[in-house]
Amino acid sequence: MNTATKVKNLRRWSGEATVYRLDPPYRGEEYVVVSSIHLPKSPWKEETMIFASTEAGEVPSYFDLAVVKEYSHAAALASIGYEVKS
């Protein structure tokens, strides 16, 4: 089973952002930031994006690995085949 383990919450992001450790790595990326935001003026209303990151939450590129049109870290991680480990 592919698992995503929460490492830490990030404070300087809009919405809710968390660093996860992926096991096994996804496309060579062991750490990702999953960011959920509300978009009141968008037809989607909310979205969650996944970005490759360091363990500290630094994002070298804002090219997203995945996007889902809902406010859910679990749904975004499931879209790339991972289950959040509790």
Model-based region annotation:
Residues 1-3, 16, 46, 52, ...:
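A detector of low-complexity, intrinsically disordered, Ser/Thr/Gly/Pro/Ala-rich segments
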Residues 65-86:
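Short, compact, well-ordered microdomains
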Residues 25-71:
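Acidic, low-complexity, intrinsically disordered interaction modules
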Residues 7, 55-57, 79:
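Compositionally biased non-globular segments, especially hydrophobic aliphatic-rich helices
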Residues 1-26:
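Negatively charged, low-complexity tracts enriched in Asp/Glu with abundant Ser/Thr
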